[in-house]
Regions:
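Structured beta-strand/loop patches that form or line metal/cofactor-binding pockets in enzymes
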Residues: 1-48, 52, 342-350, 398, ...
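Conserved, mostly hydrophobic/aromatic
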Residues: 6, 44, 108, 121, ...
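Metal- or metallocofactor-binding catalytic centers and their adjacent structured scaffolds
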Residues: 40-120, 406-415
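Hydrophobic faces of well-ordered beta-strands that scaffold small-molecule active sites
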Residues: 47, 136-140, 181-185, 211-215, ...
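Shared catalytic-loop signature of beta/alpha-barrel
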Residues: 59, 230, 243-260, 265-374
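Metal-dependent enolase-superfamily TIM-barrel catalytic cores that perform enediolate-based chemistry
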Residues: 129, 134-252
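Extended hydrophobic packing segments that form well-structured cores
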Residues: 371-415
């Protein structure tokens, strides 16, 4: 029998280039931060994980890592227990300990699954219950964006996207390159009527494409209610139009268009009030902050029981995260919508062989045991050096936006 007790846990912060994408919080910084987690067993098997790379996450992982030595990689309850002890011991330094707990567990748990899969010759999708779909469909994630970051001399390859016409160009490029079928617009940047004009331009250009829009809570309930006649029948779901469960319940009560969320139902404690108030009918899961792959499968089961739709949230990520997302989605029977991914926006990669390739907008589950991906150590070293050089330790889209628009002010809701 393989010795699957944990011998070492290594956490390496990295930074990779990110375009100047716009959202309600501001503008993406030139570098996105991630952490690469390696869980090594006593037999020398190394499992991989990828998660957030901001200072609070890195500090917590640094405390948790040595406490995991001797724990078997199958002992997920032990992981939760030891992570909770860290949260309790360090609680005076955490403003939202429960949210950090699920992020700490989510970071390490994936690497434990990968290590166990590699040790036993089984794919993670099989360990999660078995593959239920041959391919996993993803959506084109459309953003308004500046031509280049503040201080850069020339535009990036995407160029400026601030009009409906340029949104159509952006969507066409993603469809041509990756074959995506569904289109998602990140909104909450401009006046709602302007963003809905962008949706109409997309509908005209791509009449068969399912559309969705995500204002990130930027609209008031009153604004959202006024906009519903334009959105009903146009979008497959409306994601986080306004703030909170109660505010969105007001909206859902008067529309057949399902509301979706990745902002206001992000913990198991949010599910009962959401279900009771019928606020969101689609949940966007994310193993990075729900507590890992098992917790995300548990969430999927709850959604199935209560008749909630299920999709998958994304943030700026690289290939280890994308592989984990693909395994999870392939093992989730009730995945009812195409998943989100930021992958087309990233040019760097940390796995051998380069970026995973979309075919007709979908990914196949990587072959091989565990997650089926291998860490590219030269890329890891280069991206770690980026982290050391870039000077960014937290995500601050608002500060980045003010470099472009000094008078810009954050608001949620804003319109």
């Amino acid at each position: 029998m393989p010795d699957t007790r944990i011998a070492h846990v290594r956490v390496t912060p990295i930074a990779f280039y990110d375009p100047p994408l716009l959202n309600n919080s501001g503008c993406h910084q030139p570098f996105a931060l991630r952490s690469i987690i390696e869980v090594e067993t006593e037999d020398g098997v190394v499992g991989l994980g990828e998660s957030y790379g901001t200072t609070p996450i890195l500090d917590g992982l640094a405390i948790i890592a040595p406490r995991l030595c001797g724990l078997d990689v199958t002992n997920l309850n032990g992981l939760w227990s030891r992570a909770r002890c860290v949260i309790n011991d360090e609680s005076s330094g955490y403003t939202n300990p429960e949210n950090l707990l699920t992020r700490f567990v989510g970071a390490i748990e994936v690497a434990m699954w990968d290590a166990f899969g590699k040790a036993t010759g089984r794919r993670v999708v099989d360990l999660l219950g078995g593959q239920v779909r041959e391919t996993v469909p993803f959506s084109a994630y459309l953003f308004y964006k500046f031509a280049q970051h503040h201080g850069e001399a020339t535009p990036d390859d995407w160029g400026e996207v601030l009009t409906p016409e340029r949104l159509v160009d952006e969507a066409q490029y993603m469809i041509d390159q990756h074959g995506f079928k569904a289109l998602k617009l990140k909104a909450g940047v401009f006046e709602p009527e302007e963003e809905i004009a962008g949706l109409h331009a997309l509908r005209t250009a791509f009449p068969e494409a399912p559309l969705r829009i995500d204002p990130n809570g930027a609209w008031t309930p009153e604004t959202t209610l006024q906009l519903l006649p334009q959105l009903d029948g146009l979008v497959e779901y409306l994601e986080d139009p306004t703030c909170g469960i109660q505010g969105n319940a007001r909206v859902q009560a008067v529309t057949k268009t399902p509301l979706a969320t990745n902002m206001y139902v992000v913990h198991t404690s949010h599910l009962p009030p959401n279900i009771a108030q019928d606020a969101f009918r689609v949940i966007l899961s994310d193993h990075h902050y729900w507590g890992g792959l098992k917790a995300s499968r548990d969430l999927a089961r709850i959604c199935e029981i209560w008749g909630l739709g299920l999709s998958m949230h994304s943030n700026s990520h690289l290939g280890i995260s994308l592989a984990a997302m693909t395994h999870l989605a392939a093992a989730t029977p009730n995945l009812t919508y195409d998943c989100d991914t930021h992958s087309p926006w990233q040019t760097d990669e940390v796995i051998e062989g380069g970026k995973m390739i979309f075919t007709d907008g979908a990914l196949t589950v990587p072959e091989g045991p565990g997650l089926g991906v291998t860490l590219d150590r030269e890329s890891l070293a280069r991206l770690h050096q980026n982290y050391l050089n870039c000077g960014i330790t937290i995500r601050d889209d608002a500060a980045e936006m003010k470099k472009h628009r000094p008078n810009w002010e954050f608001g949620r809701p804003k319109f």
